[in-house]
Curated annotation (Swiss-Prot):
Belongs to the glycosyl hydrolase 29 family. The record marks 292 as: May be important for catalysis. It catalyses: an alpha-L-fucoside + H2O = L-fucose + an alcohol. One of its GO terms (biological process) is fucose metabolic process. Coiled coil: none annotated. GO terms for molecular function: alpha-L-fucosidase activity. It is found in: Secreted. Its EC number is 3.2.1.51. The lineage of its organism: Eukaryota, Metazoa, Chordata, Craniata, Vertebrata. Alpha-L-fucosidase is responsible for hydrolyzing the alpha-1,6-linked fucose joined to the reducing-end N-acetylglucosamine of the carbohydrate moieties of glycoproteins. This is Plasma alpha-L-fucosidase. It comes from Pongo abelii (Sumatran orangutan).
Length: 465
């Protein structure tokens, strides 16, 4: 600064000194105590219910043997299930340990941008990656998992960071992480377990530091906890961590959590309820829930021995999505990449098929609410969603009637006001009221090539009761 400039700048500088300091980053007006009563009162961020559909990704060292299940280590070493024991005997030397799979987990062809593009094409609105499964191997360079993480072993890459950047730069999806609280064979956990969890060495030195590290470094907007190892939430200090997550963390305003925070917490505490794997009750629940399920009927991780009949068809997947959303849930659909980091053709096909279906019918899925009836009482495989502000009810039907007439027992038409359209077709359809309740809709006569989509269709009904 030159001396002659001082007089000219003195007044503005004085004003700056007199101005109040800039406000700190906004915190939620509500502060949460480290108690379930307080934490359970937190309102779930609206984006999660609006999203409806997410992708689960089970990937890790278990993708190297890629046999039987992602629980390979447990079934082989702990339960000693014969087919796993025989698999190891037939394919690896007697001295081979599970840890020896680590260097073989190369992720040689992993391309986060390609993954992100596939997920975007699927129509999903969020993803959840297994940052650490029950084996303890972390897909980031955890400071608390020395020599058993993706930086020190195998890929020599920060998988979590690469996917986080790709998702946030290339898509409109929310980024989420799965994290297993316990580890099957970690000596500190086993020692704590032997003390009936009176000792807390493992959560203090491993679990909690890693959770803070994950949230601060990668800012996941879904934190999907799992694997309590039979220990109560007090052992994990779950309420203390969640109070920090909701009050102080960089994702405090938008993060959603599930209900797996200690023995007895499932379907009782947390943000949204998962209840159990593949949970699909078929009826309305009083709390937001998620159906986490997997395309491979037998495993969450990739299996080399899987046959085509082991995978759910696109028709079955669309049905799961429709049933789940009609009953107020979200669908979290799982894939298992290969050890090389590729998404196999069958998984990619299912994802892209779901995306093409949602391009036509997403209006009946995203940002919808449950209706007074979840499914129809006259015609099977008809499920309802709604948008009350727009006075819209959607009837999603999974079988096209051969008669060309769709009978709906639940909606009551309003003469002169009700309008019915087929999504992807656009023209108003003819309908008549039935004698007691419901309506009969005349579907358009279309060839297979004129159909707006395959695997399920949606009617938009305006002004029905």
């Amino acid at each position: 600064m030159r001396p002659q400039e001082l007089p000219r700048l003195a007044f503005p500088l004085l004003l700056l000194l007199l101005l109040p300091p800039p406000p700190c980053p906004a915190h939620s007006a509500t502060r949460f105590d480290p108690t379930w009563e307080s934490l359970d009162a937190r309102q779930l961020p609206a984006w999660f219910d609006q999203a409806k559909f997410g992708i689960f990704i089970h990937w890790g060292v278990f993708s190297v043997p890629s046999f039987g299940s992602e629980w390979f280590w447990w079934y082989w070493q702990k339960e000693k299930i014969p087919k796993y024991v025989e698999f190891m005997k037939d394919n690896y030397p007697p001295s081979f340990k599970y840890e020896d799979f680590g260097p073989l987990f190369t992720a040689k062809f992993f391309n986060a941008n390609q993954w992100a593009d596939i997920f975007q094409a699927s129509g999903a609105k969020y993803i959840v990656l297994t940052s650490k499964h029950h084996k303890g191997f972390t897909l980031w360079g955890s400071e608390y998992s020395w020599n058993w993480n993706a930086i020190d072993e195998g890929p020599k890459r920060d998988i979590v960071k690469e996917l986080e950047v790709a998702i946030r730069n290339r898509t409109d999806l929310r980024f989420g992480l799965y994290y297993s609280l316990f580890e099957w064979f970690h000596p500190l956990f086993l020692e704590d377990e032997s003390s009936s969890f009176h000792k807390r060495q493992f959560p203090v030195s491993k679990t909690l530091p890693e959770l803070y590290e994950l949230v601060n470094n990668y800012q996941p907007e879904v934190l999907w906890s799992d694997g309590d190892g039979g220990a109560p939430d007090q052992y994990w200090n779950s309420t203390g961590f969640l109070a920090w997550l909701y009050n102080e963390s960089p994702v405090r305003e938008t993060v959603v959590t599930n209900d797996r925070w200690g023995a007895g917490s499932i379907y009782k505490h947390g943000g949204f309820y998962t209840c159990s794997d593949r949970y699909n009750p078929g009826h309305l629940l009083p709390h937001k829930w998620e159906n986490c399920m997997t395309i491979d009927k037998l495993s969450w991780g990739y299996r080399r021995e899987a046959g085509i009949s082991d995978y759910l068809t696109i028709e079955e997947l669309v049905k799961q999505l429709v049933e789940t959303v009609s009953c107020g849930g979200n669908l979290l659909m799982n894939i298992g990449p290969t050890l090389d980091g590729t998404i196999s053709v069958v998984f990619e096909e299912r994802l892209r098929q779901m995306g093409s279906w949602l391009k036509v019918n997403g209006e009946a899925i995203y940002e919808t609410h449950t209706w007074q009836s979840q499914n129809d009482t006259v015609t099977p495989d008809v499920w309802y969603t709604s948008k009350p502000k727009e006075k819209l009810v959607y009837a999603i039907f999974l079988k096209w009637p051969t008669s060309g007439q769709l009978f709906l027992g639940q909606p009551k038409a309003i003469l002169g006001a009700t309008e019915v359209k087929l999504l992807g077709h656009g023209q108003p359809l003819n309908w008549i009221s039935l004698e007691r309740n419901g309506i009969m809709v005349e579907l358009p006569q279309l060839t297979i090539h004129q159909m707006p989509c395959k695997w399920g269709w949606a009617l938009a009904l305006t002004n029905v009761i």
